[in-house]
Amino acid sequence: MSSGGLLLLLGLLTLWAELTPVSSLDRPKKPGLCPPRPQKPPCVRECKNDWRCPGERKCCRYGCIYECRDPIFVK
């Protein structure tokens, strides 16, 4: 491969790496608050962050319990 082709490939890889989000940490949290703690067995992990929950649901943490819940809004 010529040095020009290699340089172009390196430039494209660098651009791709810059434009690809590393993780969901780059995303903002969804609006609203988590409702009161549910009655569930200990340490259920249904999600890791809001973006792993469908629609408007939030990933809510209650001790070692993580689950997708509909948000509540407080005025």
UniProtKB/Swiss-Prot annotation:
Expressed by the venom gland. InterPro entries: Elafin-like_sf, WAP_dom, WAP_four-disulfide_core. One of its GO terms (biological process) is venom-mediated disruption of cell wall in another organism. Residues 1-24 form the signal peptide. It comes from Demansia vestigiata (Lesser black whip snake). Keywords: Antibiotic, Antimicrobial, Disulfide bond, Secreted, Signal. Residues 27-72 form the WAP domain. This is Veswaprin-c. Belongs to the venom waprin family. One of its GO terms (molecular function) is serine-type endopeptidase inhibitor activity. GO terms for cellular component: extracellular region; extracellular space. Pfam families: WAP (PF00095). Disulfide bonds join 34-60, 43-64, 47-59, 53-68. PANTHER family: ANTILEUKOPROTEINASE, WHEY ACDIC PROTEIN WAP.
